[in-house]
UniProtKB/Swiss-Prot annotation:
Cofactor: Mg(2+)
Residue sites binding substrate per the record: 64-66, 77, 81-83, 91
Family according to the record: Belongs to the dUTPase family.
Complex formation: Homotrimer.
PANTHER family tied to this protein: DEOXYURIDINE 5'-TRIPHOSPHATE NUCLEOTIDOHYDROLASE
InterPro entries: dUTPase, dUTPase-like, dUTPase-like_sf, dUTPase_trimeric
Protein name: Deoxyuridine 5'-triphosphate nucleotidohydrolase
Encoding gene (name): dut
The protein's enzyme class: hydrolase
Organism, as annotated: Mycolicibacterium gilvum (strain PYR-GCK)
Function: This enzyme is involved in nucleotide metabolism: it produces dUMP, the immediate precursor of thymidine nucleotides and it decreases the intracellular concentration of dUTP so that uracil cannot be incorporated into DNA.
Length: 154
């Protein structure tokens, strides 16, 4: 099943988001400006496009794995969220995770990828306890960060 996605090209000199290979989940987003990121620096980078995510779906902005592995370029709030009601330009909050080498991003470079997925929109129902709501206890309970172990330091 194929869903269409309305895309407005805000910068006519940049390519539309595109898949590198047939069947890829994400479409590449391009930088609309030149950016220099020093070690540890971050910048909000425009992509020159706006999209209309359909109701009941969400756009998720992910780092490009090759850039993360090769030069340490990532996204601060990964994945970034593009809600169905948002109609502005997609911007990506990039960060240079390398501690010693600056990263130069050129206008037109692929900087991130957009995935569009269906999302549940549950109605929130306040309860005083999970027992009252008829929700069974779990073996995890309220165990949070590090509660499952799996690393020598935990």
């Amino acid at each position: 099943m194929s869903t269409s996605l309305a895309v407005v090209r805000l910068d006519p000199d940049l390519p539309l988001p595109s898949r590198a290979h047939d069947g890829d989940a994400g479409v590449d987003l391009y930088s609309a400006q030149d950016v220099e990121l020093g070690p540890g620096e971050r910048a909000l980078v425009p992509t020159g496009v706006a999209v209309a995510i359909p109701h009941g779906m969400v756009g998720l902005i992910h780092p490009r794995s090759g850039l993360a592995a090769r030069v340490g370029l990532s996204i601060v709030n990964t994945p970034g969220t593009v809600d169905a009601g948002y109609r502005g330009e997609i911007k990506v909050c990039l960060i240079n995770l390398d501690t010693s080498t600056p990263i130069t991003i050129g206008r037109g470079d692929r900087i991130a990828q957009l995935l569009v997925q269906r999302v549940e929109l549950p109605e929130l129902v306040e309860v005083t306890s999970f027992d009252e709501a008829g929700l069974a206890d779990t073996t995890r309970g309220d165990g949070g960060y590090g509660s499952s172990g799996g690393h020598a330091s935990l």
